[in-house]
Amino acid sequence: MSSRKILPTKLNLINLRKQIRLTRTIKRLLENKREVLLIYLREYANEYEKLYSEVSQLLKEVYETYLMGVSAEGISTVESYANSVPPSLQVKSDLKVLFGVRIPIVKLDENSIQPQPFGDIEVSPYITKSRDAIAEAFKKILELVEMESAIRSLSTELRKTQRLINAIDSYILPYYTSSAKYIKGVLDDRTREEFVRLKMIRKVLQRRRGENVGNR
């Protein structure tokens, strides 16, 4: 939008200056928000990296223990154990708000973990150990999912915030400042023209008064 489309009036100049001050305040708030989002992102990224390594190691140990159980029991027996246990795990979902950003939360319902899924069947301790370990690993996997969601949501909000800052710097503030400069220039020109006009009128009046005095 061209700044010349705005009527060059004092009221518009006052309003534009208010808009400039308000826009600069909004920009500072957005910059503060950006810094806070970056802090949260760094924290989540560091926590995610640590937890990812922990989960990877835990799953490796679970797999090794499970393989020892398979070696002891046989794959067909282990499969029959697995088929005899009905699915029971459940997760609970919720939302939390972090600095205005909605982040989904997913947690394992620990009440849904069966304490003795195999009943009175005697199974290899490796199978029991791997089963307990995978339940613990699943909790941490859900924590990873939550962290990924948080990182994704915070990154999206960060991009939106940066786009707003860019819009202020590239379009909004330049438009307001150029419009204010244009109006001030027009008003200054009018003031100078009015000053010159009044000065000329004063000279004419003084000359006429001088002529009237001379005619007496």
From Swiss-Prot:
Membrane topology term: Peripheral membrane protein
Broad class of the protein's primary localization: membrane
Alphabetized UniProt keyword annotations: ATP synthesis, Cell membrane, Hydrogen ion transport, Ion transport, Membrane, Transport
InterPro entries, A to Z: V_ATPase_D (IPR002699)
GO cellular component: plasma membrane
Highest taxon of the lineage: Archaea
Cell compartments where the protein resides: Cell membrane
GO biological process, one term: proton motive force-driven plasma membrane ATP synthesis
GO MF entry, a single one: proton-transporting ATP synthase activity, rotational mechanism
Pfam families per record: ATP-synt_D
Processing after translation: The N-terminus is blocked.
Role noted for this protein: Component of the A-type ATP synthase that produces ATP from ADP in the presence of a proton gradient across the membrane.
Homology family: Belongs to the V-ATPase D subunit family.
Database matches in NCBIfam families: PRK00373.1-3, V_ATPase_subD
Quaternary organization: Has multiple subunits with at least A(3), B(3), C, D, E, F, H, I and proteolipid K(x).
Protein's recorded name: A-type ATP synthase subunit D
Species in which this protein is naturally found: Sulfurisphaera tokodaii (strain DSM 16993 / JCM 10545 / NBRC 100140 / 7) (Sulfolobus tokodaii)
Gene this chain is encoded by: atpD
